[in-house]
A protein has these predicted regions:
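P-loop NTPase nucleotide-binding core
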Residues: 1-97, 113, 130
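A generic local structural motif
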Residues: 84-86, 117-122
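Sensor-1/coupling segment of RecA-like P-loop NTPase cores
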Residues: 91-100, 106-112, 119-146
Length: 146
């Protein structure tokens, strides 16, 4: 893929235990991986997640990256608003975004997972500037989801 026209975003959701754990991890991955500098990630947060006060942490190890905590809850943002972020970011940066989600079968373990799956499909199917790659290590669970 041409990096000038395609931006890949990867997240592993193995440790996500709930729908809003996923939305937080999803939004952080998008903000960090579509920005080439921390300053741009912060600008993206200010533009697209204006109702949040992110917490940014730095590691004393100069090799380590910074981390962002958004604390997204249903009070601040609806699931649909978070799921629309890739499309909004793709338009802003002028690239097609490919979101790769590993351990996708975890969604099947969440409370009300059928509703979450319908919500994801309902939003994602209308996005024109974003593609999704869904990976899972438990074939039977992935088959059940689809």
């Amino acid at each position: 893929m041409n990096p000038d026209i395609v931006q890949t975003v990867y997240l592993d959701i193995y440790d996500c235990r709930s729908e809003y754990d996923f939305y937080n991890k999803f939004a952080v991955a998008l903000m960090k991986q579509t920005a080439n500098k921390m300053e741009l990630a912060i600008e993206n947060i200010k533009q697209f997640l204006v109702r949040l006060s992110p917490k940014i942490s730095f590691s004393p190890d100069p090799v380590s990256d910074y981390s962002i905590s958004l604390g997204i809850t249903p009070k601040e943002y609806s699931p649909e608003e978070i799921l629309e972020l890739p499309e909004l970011l793709a338009k802003r940066i002028g690239k097609h975004i490919v979101v790769c989600i590993d351990e996708f079968q975890q969604i099947g373990e969440w409370q009300d997972s059928i509703t979450v799956q319908k919500r994801l499909r309902g939003v994602w199917q209308h996005q024109q500037h974003v593609s999704y790659c869904l990976f899972g290590s438990k074939q039977h669970m992935m088959t059940h989801l689809f």
